[in-house]
Structures are given as C-alpha cells and as structure tokens.
Amino acid sequence: SANGPGNALSTRANDLAPVAGTMAVRGPGLTITLDDAEGSGTDTVGAGPREDTNPAEGRVQARDLQLVVNDLWRAGAQAVAVNGHRLTSMSAIRFAGAAIIVNYRPLGRPYIVTAIGTPKTFPAAFAQGPGGSYLATLRSTFNISVDVTTQGSLELPASVSVSTRYATAVNNVSGKDGS
C-alpha cells in the first residue's frame, strides 16, 4: 500500500537526509574564514611571526578547524562544510604533513568553514562560546587571519563520502546456542 511501512521508512530517511549530510541544504548561518599569519610559511626556518618560536605557530592547524567545527555543532549548527566538503558523523579533519585533510581530501588555504543554523540563536551561541574565544586567541596570539560573517543564505553540498553500513544476523554461532 502507498501508506505502508516502506513509505514511512522512506519519509523518515528523507527527513534525516539534511542532518545526515546525504542531501544539499540551504539556510542562514555563519562563514568563518581562517588563513595563516603573514610570514608563517614553513619553508624557511625562523620565518614565523615569532622568530624564536616554532614557525608553524602562525599556521592554521587541523586542531584549529576541529575545535571550531566542534563548537559550531555545540552552538546549534544543523550542517557544516569546510572548503565545500560537507561534514558528517564519519568525517575527519586531520594533518598529513603540512596539509590539512578533510574527508581524505587535502585543503588549500584559506580555510572556509560554513555552517547553517537558526539565525536568532546560532551566531550568538557560537560567538559567546568556546569557539568565539578560540578564534579571538588565534587572531591575537598567533596573528592568524580570522573573519566571521553572518550570512542570510548559504548552500552546503551533500557529502560525497557517506556510505551505508549494516549488520546481518548470524545463525548458530558456535558456543552461543549451547551446541
């Protein structure tokens, strides 16, 4: 029948698709642009903004993006992307050498984090929370370029790395049924 369990399951899957990252979404939110501090290249020793410290300190690190993204979720983000790569519960933000990798794809700078959330609460919840404080520290301590703007309409793509995994029942597992 048209109103059977299959239809209800399909409706539920469609309802969850935006938060699961399996479909593109549009809505108001934030754009956060992060870029390395001027003179922070690692090709020359001592080229960082603090000559007596690690030159990588003026560079955006994977952990910076991790902290910002995690706080966007905490603040109420409904969808998040980094440089156009939609994040899901299976996404990873990592370092590979000097490159930042998201969903196994290297990113170029600047790093643009886009997040969709409720306009009345989301921007303030992020700005007043740990993420807003962390961005201020990146700017003031490490001279990292930080720009946060509220957007009336953003479009985030569907994730290309979502895969469905499932389990099946195993019958007569040795030692489990008393045999």
Model-derived segments and spans:
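Extracytoplasmic/luminal low-complexity segments enriched in Pro/Gly and acidic/polar residues
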Residues: 116-179
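Structural motif
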Residues: 30, 79-80, 111-112, 144-146, ...
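Flexible glycine-/small-residue-rich
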Residues: 32-38, 84, 104, 115-117, ...
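Juxtamembrane "stalk/linker" segments
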Residues: 1-34, 40-42
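Soluble extracytoplasmic domains of inner/organellar membrane proteins
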Residues: 53-130
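A solvent-exposed, charged loop/short amphipathic helix patch at secondary-structure junctions
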Residues: 46-54
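Solvent-exposed alpha-helices and their adjacent loops that cap or buttress functional pockets
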Residues: 23-25, 103-106, 147-148
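Intrinsically disordered, low-complexity boundary segments flanking structured domains
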Residues: 14-21, 100-102, 133, 140-145
